Amino acid sequence: MTATKMNAQEIIQFIANAEKKTSVKVTFEGQLATAVPSSVVKLGNVLFGDWKDVAPLLEGLVENQDYVVEQDARNSAVPLLDKRAINARIEPGAIIRDQVKIGDNAVIMMGAVINIGAEIGAGTMIDMGAILGGRAIVGKNSHVGAGAVLAGVIEPVSAEPVRVGDNVLIGANAVVIEGVQIGSGSVVAAGAIVTQDVPENVVVAGVPARIIKEIDAQTQQKTALEDALRTL
């Protein structure tokens, strides 16, 4: 399913109105004394559900009261994205929240964190450990390097998100500050901190980032993407 594009106010309302859940997986021994409610899934001696629904069942265990609880969140408002219908390569360990849009043949590497409302264009790679904050937008056939940060904006509502154009390369550990726009075809050097908009087809570097040259044939050759990595 493709997420519906949401503005900041809609995201805030989505989070505020969402049922807060502490999802758990519980493996238990013994017999349950009470019927399992519809909100809990029971497969053999394993329970899946919200802790508030599962906990009363464990209090009524008969014969043996041993159980193990696995959980990864507390009162979470935003579930993780259901990735089954996404036509992209998503590696283990990537954390992608609900209401994220991912284009065809995109690549999301291990450890990437993508927050609610972010958009990733077709053929774009988000490398290991990169962070896309809330509502950050990356165009088509771009590359966000390992450890790079595209700052998110959900509050204040009036703030603008980061927008990255098509065919952009953002180097490892670069940081793009809230509201900054990166023009299509540009390159952000590794470690740069981008505090102002970047026009199309230039290279920026430094802290704060400044234009050091326009894109030339040599730069295009060095920063060319590999289509083979995006083959499904």
Curated annotation (Swiss-Prot):
Copy the pathway line from the protein's UniProt record. Amino-acid biosynthesis; L-lysine biosynthesis via DAP pathway; LL-2,6-diaminopimelate from (S)-tetrahydrodipicolinate (acetylase route): step 1/3
Q: What class of enzyme is it?
A: transferase
Q: Which PROSITE patterns match?
A: HEXAPEP_TRANSFERASES
EC no.?
2.3.1.89
Which GO molecular-function terms appear in the entry? Answer: tetrahydrodipicolinate N-acetyltransferase activity
Which InterPro entries does the UniProt record give? DapH, DapH_N, Hexapep, Hexapep_transf_CS, Trans_hexapeptide_repeat, Trimer_LpxA-like_sf
Q: Which reaction does it catalyse?
A: (S)-2,3,4,5-tetrahydrodipicolinate + acetyl-CoA + H2O = L-2-acetamido-6-oxoheptanedioate + CoA
Q: Which Pfam families match?
A: DapH_N, Hexapep, Hexapep_2
Q: Which family does it belong to?
A: Belongs to the transferase hexapeptide repeat family. DapH subfamily.
Indicate what this protein is called per its UniProt record. 2,3,4,5-tetrahydropyridine-2,6-dicarboxylate N-acetyltransferase
Q: Which organism is it from?
A: Streptococcus pneumoniae (strain Taiwan19F-14)
